[in-house]
Amino acid sequence: MAGHLVNYGKHRTRRSYARIKEVLDLPNLIKIQTNSYQWFLDEGLKEMFDDIMPIDDFQGKLSLEFVGYQLLEPKYTVEEARQHDANYSAPLHVTLRLTNHETGEIKSQDVFFGDFPLMTKQGTFIINGAERVIVSQLVRSPGVYFHSETDKNSRVTYGTTVIPNRGAWLEYETDAKDIAYVRIDRTRKIPLTELVRALGFGSDQDIINMFGDNDSLMLTLEKDVHKNTDDSRTDEALKDIYERLRPGEPKTADSSRSLLYARFFDPKRYDLASVGRYKVNKKLSLKTRLLNQVLAETLADPDTGEVIAQKGTKVDRQVMDKLAPYLDRDDFKTITYQPSDQGVVTDPIELQSIKVYSQVTPDKEINLIGNGHIGKKVKHIVPADVLASMNYFLNLQEGLGSIDDIDHLGNRRIRSVGELLQNQFRIGLSRMERVVRERMSIQDTATVTPQQLINIRPVVASIKEFFGSSQLSQFMDQTNPLGELTHKRRLSALGPGGLTRDRAGYEVRDVHYTHYGRMCPIETPEGPNIGLINSLASYAVVNPYGFIETPYRRVSWDTHKVTDKIDYLTADEEDNYIVAQANSPLNDDGSFVDETVLARHKDNNIEISPDKVDYMDVSPKQVVAVATACIPFLENDDSNRALMGANMQRQAVPLVNPHAPLVGTGMEYKAAHDSGTAVLANNAGTVEYVDAKQIRVRREDGALDAYNLMKFKRSNAGKNYNQRPIVTIGDHVDVDEIIADGPAMQNGELALGQNPIIAFMTWNMYNYEDAIVLSERLVKDDVYTSIHIEEYESEARDTKLGPEEVTREIPNVGEEALKDLDEFGVVRVGAEVRDGDILVGKVTPKGVTELSAEERLLHAIFGEKAREVRDTSLRVPHGGGGIIQDVKIFTREAGDELSPGVNMMVRVYITQKRKIQVGDKMAGRHGNKGTVSVVVPEEDMPYLPDGTPVDICLSPMGVPSRMNIGQVLELHLGMAARNLGIHVATPVFDGANDKDLWATVKEAGMASDGKSVLYDGRTGEPFENRVSVGIMYYMKLSHMVDDKIHARSIGPYSLVTQQPLGGKAQFGGQRFGEMEVWALEAYGAAYTLQEILTYKSDDVVGRVKTYEAIVKGEPIPKPGVPESFRVLVKELQALGLDMKVLGADKKEIELRDMDDDEDDIVSVDALAKFAAQQEEKKAHEAAAQATDGKSANSTDDKK
């Protein structure tokens, strides 16, 4: 037997064809969300308050300090928040201390800081009753970046950018003449030496002493206007810089000093963040820069004088291991520079300097300047960083140092929920800080309390804005559990502070070698967002700095055996090592079998001897994301189709009777477990009670845990979310075990579709162009039936003319239409409703004119009933019919929170049971998608020799050109699994190979080619050729024809052009565009064309008359002028063109009955006459219509 048995949970055993043993379990798949939010609560919030506080007033009399904070119990549970359209949030209370420095008095107080949204266990937020996900953002990391460009003359110019987390950018660049310039915050260029002078090194000699003899530097000094003077020229340089930054303002050295200090060295204005400091130190420290350089001086121990490395030594890994402890010391090769008193910063600057030989001219000595030992706590840039980065930049021309690749994942980092929230909170707090300062100067210092100073509105507003309208706060995709899980693991390069679709080029979107094990190379949307939205790879984790790490098995450096020790490496760290693939064959002791091993180093695939290998992949599926890892035989599919397969699995509709795939990958259990839709046991124990709505587990300590199951709830996508127990009374359950399946799950595994019998054959051309032929059995047996729940709501508001009323008594509505309404006018649960039926009867007061004496008398006698009301009932929209599943009524009397002006709100849930039908979209897991073209009676479908009819016929033409051969392999293995009565797992890149496949096919007693003779269901004759028949997992996707089919009768029109609106949502018409007009012109179908462009579109008068003519059975009148023509005339007149319309007799035609031309100002008499004519006309029409009451009613209604 090929393969071995593996248990997935307690309810499923699969035969697995994996050969590689799993040394590491998959991490919790939503950890990226939950860990980040937990960090925010534990540390992020406190960091924010510590940053902003203490707040001092302008005179220094008062000081407001932060003491601590606590989150109290949430007002609603998760379920209550959903029902009440509220937020799942907890009140945040902050303890503040106000110190009065004049009197020494200290006041402490608890201040309420608003309700703070909490994350649910599933990694989501409930905002206004809807579940939302905060997507992690992929951004450029703060740090120092070096880049080069080659111009058309093949000259290489270099550039440097210092990117902070927030603050001004600092850029260096060389021009075509090799002169070095600096730009501050994208302004005009300044010679590099001017910035050095401004930092307090005013004379040329100071600069040359520090940086050494560099060609570019010398050329820059030549260009510098303050050259050839021995005395310091700091002030002049400062004035020059100020003039460039603030042109037109009076320049003084003092204002320039304070400006530069504020731009770069003020921690409140400039922030590198801890990750920026880490990256800057890593890039500029001599530890990384000395590697592979040749020393131009002998290095000795400062204490003993013992030589560590001789002059002329090349610094390789071994030499660096000896040097490293010394480079970490403060007293090793450290030079202290004292800037002049006129400089921006006057503190001594410590730099580490070592001489090495140039790579370009080997005997030339070059100063390598490191930024000294700057602690992790220094979050802003310091002069040492500026000087060391300049040195790195100048040394690039000598061949020292390396160019950065900005698409390398060592230079891109993840901002998860916690950090995004923290940034938003900072915005709110800094706005609040301004208010506090102002209030401190206004309030009486003797009596003021912290509560009086604080205004929490900006803080609350910024958090609300973030959750409500940020590009990264998204309505959760709840089509199925895989869609949920993927949404929580999504990485977006878009959003505030990220890229925009239009500016993103190919490089950013492309797959980079550092994506390996960190980001999925396959799962990304098709279309404008391709490559900008990615998915976290299955084993990847995010480190505290926000860089993605992936696990590797360590290879022992002395025995060269692969150990089970796991190291998580960032992309930067991985660049230093050689990594073998997970499928490299190993002996039992962990040594490599082969004499050469296929391995990776940076972007090279190399064959190398095993003793050079440092690490080995943990698992073959560490390359791909969760959805991609659910595709069996992924290695046999073309990447474009695999992309579609991964994306379409997220769109599968949860079915009424889900079945897990016969051919799985072993990923189904983990995906379902971590998705958050299943019910997991919180504690171990024994099941005491089970029914459809509740499971009770007796814990080992004697306490009882009760789990309430979700029954027929509407998901965000309008699908049915339902949970069903999979345990029975007496079962023992472990912690974290699945005790109830969620939607699209079976026995704790993901079950997105079904396992039908599929044949690759044509059937009467019905499966031309990816169409699908279905057997009626799939309809009859509810194989692909799904439940959809739609929510409708109606509000009764206060209007200017009185309150709206929910009632049964609706004007002009017969008893038949009210049969399902209760005494209050709300539809009953269980009623079957069709399009246009009333769900909530509601009337709104009409505008009442001044009443006459008689009417007032009637009012007094009969009360309110005589008042005019109009029908504003909630009705079932087109295609929305079904069965009323639930009705919820919210009123102020019952204590529900309603919006202002709303007295009552009714919510109605309608359930539809949708069977598969012609027009529905279906797909397999290999990107093999299609739409149903015909449903054939079971008896007419082709059948197998044993009489079993085939369920689905797919076109064989869908395979060769698309190169997704995985579907054919799945088909054969699926048939073998069905015949053997087993489920199989074939993990990605480590699944069944052709030997395993044919061995299993043989074991199942199938033909050696995997094909079968098929018989025509209509004639009973065998088909000419043998056909590939088998079991393939096939899903119904959420693009159903019921949601798309649409027809318009008379509907809304656009206000200006008077043409029908477009789209199903607006009950719009079909667009008849330019090319369609050409088609009718080519046919010579003049009358058809005329009526399309007039009656059916924007001939306002004509369409009313046409309607009347149709109702009365009269001939259709001649068409009039389309409204859009009049719009065109008016637009041309608005441009100042005197546009007139002439008839055949060259006389001007008036486009309106009355034109408001200046020559033709209409008199009051003329208006009165016109009104009288109109009244008369109406009276005539009314008389004519009275003859036929029925038609009059219908005309009125439509009008």
Curated annotation (Swiss-Prot):
Q: Which family does it belong to?
A: Belongs to the RNA polymerase beta chain family.
For whether the record's keyword set contains Transcription, the answer is yes
Q: Which HAMAP family match?
A: RNApol_bact_RpoB
Q: Which organism is it from?
A: Lacticaseibacillus casei (strain BL23)
Q: What is the lineage of its organism?
A: Bacteria, Bacillati, Bacillota, Bacilli, Lactobacillales
Q: What is its EC number?
A: 2.7.7.6
Output this protein's name: DNA-directed RNA polymerase subunit beta
Quaternary structure note: The RNAP catalytic core consists of 2 alpha, 1 beta, 1 beta' and 1 omega subunit. When a sigma factor is associated with the core the holoenzyme is formed, which can initiate transcription.
What is the documented function of this protein?
DNA-dependent RNA polymerase catalyzes the transcription of DNA into RNA using the four ribonucleoside triphosphates as substrates.
Q: Which gene encodes it?
A: rpoB
